[in-house]
């Protein structure tokens, strides 16, 4: 059948199972929006307050559902406003397709109104980018883009379409999309070598990253941990891949990881990295990282092997399939002395905070209790992000959504909106500091417009908390441009944008506020006032070995 480029785009989105698109219209993309209007019963479009909010929402939708998130923007500034979250998605391996429109083909390269080479701009931060100048290749390009976005190590793909292509016509033939194949690239000999190394270990440790969530390998990870009788630590991106209430779980590793995880990994004789990339935030000084251990790395991306840390063995392939095959090769191991030592570390070094005043750790524990650990938590970036990772028990994958690699302030609210749309039966809560919240708080208008029942918790300490913490510890308390004590009333802002607002100043007010917000089934902002000097501990100084992890008690003893 003969269809316009815009109609072909919509039909291809339907082929891919797309049910929601996040975006913002403009001149160059009008034809596409006209086609979406005609199919509004099949594809829901969420109009955000800003294109960056659309990209963050598509990102959150993808992380919460495992599907490809889709965002759209017009040419020029519309397209460039997507860039920050395209980079966010790239760093965190999120499957996303960003669709932009550009000026007509005769105007390309002439500095035309709202013309930007968005494919060139995003080349370093996408898995692939396309410029479509011929309607005949549009359908095939869209199908390739979705395949690339979700296959292997997922990531964002950009499709830039000139406006004349969206109006031109050609023959469209529908196709049936086949599921992605789970691929492995190791030999039987390599698999057996890894199994042998595991069998010889006396003090094994499992280091879990986001790849375990992407591949859907939680059940296989749990079986692996039981088989080799090992403790499990995770990264920010790996939260929820392993049951956070399990006795084997020791918390995060790295800069704000637990003492147990950091000291335990420093003592282990075998470290097995599952879908983890040895980020600098995890390893600290790479020359001193797990220096007593042999290291095995399982990852879908061959480029990650030996990139940051030299390993002794590796298996490249889809983690779920790899672990299924590896588990079948293993006999049950028992390490009672090692596990007893880890339990002693857990008992000796529990996470601690000052519970005299209202604090973010207390707030997170109350949210955990009220929601029974079953909410989807999104965060922005900073102290609150670490507290949200430390003090909420994540028991299932795709329940902690955060910008890990890029560290994008302003990410959480849009991501929470996307997650709520993708998982409408879940309670979705965004945790943001007052600094982060300012960056994209206009997306409360989006939540209000569609009555998306997200809960926005603002941890208000009136400072840029994480930067201030570094200024306190390492910069002689010179608080350069980190004080935010101004006249912004976040509750009034929320109410002005059509949301319910609650201010919390006492510990006993936290649980009732969360319970009320959940019961309202409408967008709610909860502003929580906490002291400006609260700090995130434990902590590893940048570049130091993770064995040098310290907490507030250590600082008091030194002073």
Q: Where would I find each of the regions flagged by the language model?
A:
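Catalytic phosphate/nucleotide-handling subdomain of diverse soluble enzymes
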Residues: 411, 415-453, 459
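Glycine-rich phosphate/pyrophosphate-binding beta-alpha loops
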Residues: 27-29, 76, 93, 156, ...
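N-terminal alpha/beta PP-like core and its mobile active-site loop of ThDP/TPP-dependent enzymes
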Residues: 1-330, 366, 370-373, 453-456, ...
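Hydrophobic, well-ordered secondary-structure elements that form the walls
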Residues: 295, 367, 379, 418, ...
């Amino acid at each position: 059948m003969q269809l316009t480029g815009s109609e072909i785009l919509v039909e291809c989105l339907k082929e891919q199972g797309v049910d929601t698109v996040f975006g913002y219209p403009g001149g160059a993309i009008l034809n596409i929006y006209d086609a979406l209007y005609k199919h509004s019963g099949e594809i829901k479009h969420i109009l955000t307050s800003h294109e960056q909010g659309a990209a963050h929402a598509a990102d959150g939708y993808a992380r919460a559902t495992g599907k490809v998130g889709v965002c759209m923007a017009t040419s020029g500034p519309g397209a460039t406003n997507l860039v920050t979250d395209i980079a966010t998605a790239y760093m965190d391996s999120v499957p996303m397709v960003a669709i932009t429109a550009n000026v007509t083909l005769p105007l390309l390269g002439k500095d035309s109104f709202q013309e930007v080479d968005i494919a060139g701009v995003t080349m370093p931060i996408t898995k692939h980018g396309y410029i479509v100048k011929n309607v005949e290749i549009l359908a095939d390009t869209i199908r390739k883009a979705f395949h690339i976005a979700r296959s292997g190590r997922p990531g964002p793909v950009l499709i830039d379409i000139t406006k004349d292509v969206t109006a031109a016509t050609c023959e469209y033939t529908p196709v049936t999309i086949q599921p992605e194949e789970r691929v492995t690239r190791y030999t039987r000999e390599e698999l057996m070598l890894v199994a042998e190394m595991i069998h010889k270990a006396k003090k094994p440790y499992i280091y879990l990253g986001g790849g375990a969530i992407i591949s859907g390998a939680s059940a296989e990870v749990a079986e692996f941990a039981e088989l080799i009788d090992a403790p499990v630590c995770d990264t920010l991106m790996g939260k929820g891949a392993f049951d956070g209430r399990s006795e084997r779980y020791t918390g995060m590793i790295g800069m704000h990881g637990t003492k147990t995880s950091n000291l335990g990994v420093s003592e282990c004789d075998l470290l097995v990295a599952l879908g983890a990339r040895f980020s600098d935030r995890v390893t600290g000084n790479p020359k001193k990282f797990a220096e007593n251990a042999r290291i095995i790395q399982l990852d879908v991306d061959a480029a990650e092997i030996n990139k940051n840390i030299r390993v002794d063995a590796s298996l490249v392939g889809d983690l779920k399939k790899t672990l299924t095959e590896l588990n079948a090769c293993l006999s049950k191991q028992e390490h009672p002395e090692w596990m007893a030592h880890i339990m002693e570390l857990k008992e000796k070094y529990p996470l601690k905070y000052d519970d005299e005043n209202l604090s973010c750790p207390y707030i997170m524990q109350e949210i955990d209790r009220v929601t029974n650990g079953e909410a989807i938590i999104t965060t922005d970036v900073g102290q609150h992000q670490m507290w949200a990772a430390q003090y909420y028990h994540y028991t299932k994958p795709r329940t902690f959504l955060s910008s890990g690699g890029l560290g994008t302030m302003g990410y959480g609210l849009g991501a929470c909106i996307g997650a709520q749309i993708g998982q409408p039966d879940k309670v979705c809560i965004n945790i943001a500091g007052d600094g982060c919240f300012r960056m994209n708080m206009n997306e409360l208008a989006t939540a209000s417009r569609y009555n998306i029942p997200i809960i926005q918790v603002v941890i208000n300490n009136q400072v840029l908390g994480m930067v201030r913490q570094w200024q306190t510890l390492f910069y002689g308390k010179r608080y350069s441009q980190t004080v935010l004590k101004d006249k912004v009333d976040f509750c009034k802002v929320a109410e002005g944008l059509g949301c319910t607002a609650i201010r919390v100043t006492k510990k006993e007010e936290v649980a009732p506020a969360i319970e009320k917000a959940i019961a309202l089934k409408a967008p709610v902002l909860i502003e929580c006032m906490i002291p400006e000097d609260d700090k995130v501990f434990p902590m590893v100084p940048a570049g130091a070995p993770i064995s040098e992890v310290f907490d507030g008690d250590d600082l008091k003893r030194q002073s």
